[in-house]
Regions:
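Conserved N-terminal beta1-alpha1 strand-loop-helix module at the mouth
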Residues: 1-83, 87-91, 98-100, 105-106, ...
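Generic beta-sheet signal
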Residues: 7, 61, 109, 132, ...
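Active-site/ligand-binding-proximal alpha/beta "capping" segment
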Residues: 130, 134-135, 141-184, 190
Length: 211
């Protein structure tokens, strides 16, 4: 199944609430970005101030240099999936074991400079790989579709891996993302910056749903 996941990328609690209430009103699966202001150039609110809605599948994308610093808090939020960066200081096999004990899936995110080969050793510990084709901590920007070359390599290394895409997804490039093997497409400004985000979401969802 292919998923369109509206993203929540907020720099303050007010924006977080606004974005979260909007996208969770129409999308069954959403993607929340958390930034530390160090690994990522922008900073999201303190995770202690955040919450996630019931009845919605939530992926949390942790753009932190030290994800362990907030791991306990994230686990308490009970998301479906926590994604950490290959470039972070996380001990991913250990982190994955902790998450598994709490019934939470583990994802690994790859910045453009990180190859599929670089993360091959952690793939047996993960259920999801996020190919990053945008800019850390911001909505908007162009998708670097050259990063899609990683999709085939990742799936060759682990056939059951769920592949996600983050960065510049829109109606024009959805087909190319799906053809490359991406099944979870995280969408920011292409939904948030339209006159009717719910209608745009429905249009995108229909485009990636097989007839």
């Amino acid at each position: 199944m292919n998923h369109i996941c509206p993203t929540v990328t907020a720099l303050d609690v007010h924006a977080y609430r606004e974005q979260l209430e909007l996208v969770s009103s129409f999308a069954p699966r959403i993607h929340i970005d958390l930034m530390d202001g160090d690994f990522a150039p922008t900073a999201s609110p303190n995770p202690d101030l955040l919450w996630i809605p019931e009845g919605v599948e939530v992926d949390i994308h942790v753009m932190y240099r030290n994800p362990d610093a907030i791991l306990e808090r994230l686990i308490s939020l009970k998301p479906s999936l926590i994604i950490v960066h290959a470039e972070s200081n996380a001990d991913i096999p250990k982190l994955a074991s902790t998450l598994r004990n709490h019934g939470i899936k583990t994802g690994i995110a790859l910045l453009p400079e990180t190859s599929a080969e670089d993360v091959r050793y952690v793939l047996p510990h993960t259920q999801h790989a996020l190919i990053f084709g945008g800019h850390l901590g911001y909505h908007g920007g162009q998708a670097d579709l050259s990063q899609l070359a990683k999709a085939e390599e990742l799936l060759k290394a682990q056939r059951q891996l769920e592949l996600g895409w983050d960065g510049g997804a829109n109606l024009e490039n959805l087909d190319e993302l799906i053809r490359a093997g991406i099944s979870v497409i995280n969408v920011g400004s292409a939904i948030h910056k339209t006159d009717n985000p719910e209608t745009t979401y429905a249009t995108m969802k229909a485009k990636v749903t097989p007839v």
